Amino acid sequence: MKFTKLSLAALIAMGIASNASALENVKVDGQVKLWYQTTDMTSLSTEAASATSKNDGIFKQVGAIGDLVAKLRATGDLTKKAGFGTTIYTATTLGLENNLVSSEAITVGATNETNGITNGDSNLPMWLGEAYMTYKAGKTIVKIGRQELDTPLAFTETWNAAPNTFEAAVVVNQDLPSTTLVGAYVSRGNGAQNTTVAKSFSAYGNVGGAYTPGETGAGAYAAGVVTTLIPMTTAQAWYYDVIDVANAFWLQADVKLPYGLGLGLQYAGANATGDVQNKTLAGVKDKDTDAFAVKLSGSVVGVNLAASYSTVSSGVIPVGNTATGFTKTKLYTATILSDGRIAAQPDVDSWKIEASTKLAGFNLGASYGSYDVKENKDGLRAFDVYGLNKSKNPSEIDLSVGTKVDDINLTAYYIMQNDYAAKTVGTTVESKDRQAFRVVASINF
């Protein structure tokens, strides 16, 4: 259900305006989402007797995380040319950490570090995920403020209980036929590695020695063009300057072929610059990372099929999301857990097959990804959270089923990841295999 009117008190509370009469076409919507995941790791320690270092069994508290997140969004027009948008999030564990989960699904503490609901910030955390103004002149739209972004190397991730967002100025122009031009400056973001989102917003870029984009720095610039001028093809080209982190580019073409076939091509590169290069790369020869990916897709008797391959050269910077410590990537070969943390890492070759269909009211999906991790001899895996090395050849199976029961959207995932992490040097700890079960339930209003 969507509302077209909003009370003055609510408008003031959401920081939209102090005079409701100036607003037109106000729409309010929202969502309540319950996010839960349990993980079972095998061979976490080579010492079988070390019970404290094992999570032996799925659905146990030690390997489970979860959150309940509510979202309230309002958009509207201030004038015929100016508009606004704002989104509030609030999160709680519902006390699940007492017996069902060990931590929350997202970071919602005072910073985008490891603080959160279960370790000190338990007063129903709230944050303003979006607060922006828009202005339209002809075929040009300017959007300034806190907002979601969707570009290949800086984007909002929606897989978790709440998305990360940015403080940015974006200009979009469509004067050219069948072509969209985009220019953006990103000053801050609340993305964080693995946990994706934090309450506070930190400066974008300048990872220094911490290897965590988003904590300090001078921001990032991006420019892109998306066009459908080439028949049956959507082509896009992007350039990024993440100050003191990297210069990067992304080229992609998705082609609709005869007989319902599709062909996708991706080529991207990232060159370490500034603090990353000067402070952390002494003696490193391969400072540039290049990636190439190809995907072939089609449909047979109502089943969507696809096969993809990617190769990432040796280097330093992963070809992934600069907003979340490269947690996710838009490379075709990414799977749920083997994403920016494996598929996009330097000196990794990947392939993936996938299938999806609709059956009796259910959305079914399955995929298998295989990853050949090589030495990266002349590069540096500065952004590697798994401890990848040439002795590891991870693989992953993802199964999903989604449906709607009354007003509740339900999606369940089963994830099996094998041989994904290296033995910790000087210890007996070795995270070899793991399986995970994730459930997401939501109600939109």
For each of these PLM feature ranges, what is it?
Residues 2-149, 169-179, 227-228, 254-257, ...:
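Beta-barrel outer-membrane channel/assembly domains of diderm bacteria
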Residues 34, 142-156, 181-187, 223, ...:
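Transmembrane beta-strand segments that form the barrel wall of outer-membrane beta-barrel proteins
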Residues 41-54, 58, 97-103, 153-161, ...:
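Outer-membrane beta-barrel translocator domains and adjoining extracellular loop/strand segments
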Residues 96-118, 188, 199-203, 314-316, ...:
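Outer-membrane pore/translocation modules
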Residues 156, 160-163, 189, 215-217, ...:
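Solvent-exposed loop/turn segments connecting transmembrane beta-strands
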Residues 172-173, 178-255:
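Internal metal/ion-chelating core segments
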Residues 196-200, 208, 219-227, 235-238, ...:
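Outer membrane beta-barrel transmembrane domains
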Residues 228-232, 252-378:
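Detector for outer-membrane/organellar transmembrane beta-barrel domains
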